[in-house]
Amino acid sequence: MATSHFILKLFLVISFCNVCFASRKLTALVQEPENQLLQYHKGALLFGKISVNLIWYGKFKPSQRAIVSDFITSLSSSTPSKTDPSVAKWWKTTEKYYHLANSKKSLSLYLGKQVLVENYSLGKSLTQKQIVQLASKGEQKDAINIVLTASDVAVDGFCVNRCGTHGSSKGAIIRGKTYKFAYIWVGNSETQCAGYCAWPFHQPIYGPQSPPLVAPNNDVGVDGMVINLASLLAGTATNPFGNGYYQGEADAPLEAASACPGVYAKGAYPGYAGDLLVDKTTGASYNAHGTNGRKYLLPALYDPSTSTCSTLV
């Protein structure tokens, strides 16, 4: 269920995405083991009941939107899959960061609003500033606003050095107080760089070559988006404002999932995702069950209690 520290470092050469941040305070302090990979920077972790709002930019089929919305719903322990291993069980690893920080507060996510921007109102080539502009269409308080861009939308840095980003922005003034909201952006890489952002469902653009795996929801682009979204959600929870848990430079850090790139199951090594579960009917590879009978492939998370990459299978 885990990968050694040596393997963890070895996998850094195939990291698929960078992330970006802002800042905020936290009252709880942490006592870290000497061998802890991810350093705690005394900042805030995301806590409380948080709505996850989806802003769809460009054309997505209803079936594609359902893959992502079902994933968000699956994160909640109040609506867990009846089959193990589950998405909710995968998400529980993030709770260990709160325990390590001696925080009595916890995080509860639920699916909020979905906003469709199908008319490409900002064009088909977006800057990071425009991503934040789109993210502001979601809730402004106690929220993670996720911008998902369609396969025909280019975003600054997409496919060059990132598959998505996360950060925070000041929201509207509510009752005289300005709140921050967390945001995530993830792009559909299917027609632009599936080998970079949707591996292992597509042949990698570099490194060891192996046959691509069958995507669990039969959509290479969106199943790849779920992998990157899962990684960024874990980073958002544990390093929402740039001063939580991370290692390295603040503007390009290793976080809870990006510290374990390319690892999805035990036995993983560069070019091989690990010994995954395989659907006997479809041949699809996966490692987590979700709501509505969904199956997903989710990245390993760095477990601060064991200093290893933790996987579900």
Curated annotation (Swiss-Prot):
<keyword id="KW-0325">Glycoprotein</keyword>
<feature type="signal peptide">
    <location>
        <begin position="1"/>
        <end position="22"/>
    </location>
</feature>
<dbReference type="GO" id="GO:0048046">
    <property type="term" value="C:apoplast"/>
</dbReference>
<dbReference type="Pfam" id="PF04674">
    <property type="entry name" value="Phi_1"/>
</dbReference>
<feature type="glycosylation site" description="N-linked (GlcNAc...) asparagine">
    <location>
        <position position="119"/>
    </location>
</feature>
<comment type="function">
    <text>May be involved in the regulation of cell division.</text>
</comment>
<protein>
    <recommendedName>
        <fullName>Protein PHOSPHATE-INDUCED 1</fullName>
    </recommendedName>
</protein>
<keyword id="KW-0964">Secreted</keyword>
<comment type="similarity">
    <text>Belongs to the EXORDIUM family.</text>
</comment>
<dbReference type="InterPro" id="IPR006766">
    <property type="entry name" value="EXORDIUM-like"/>
</dbReference>
<keyword id="KW-0052">Apoplast</keyword>
<keyword id="KW-0732">Signal</keyword>
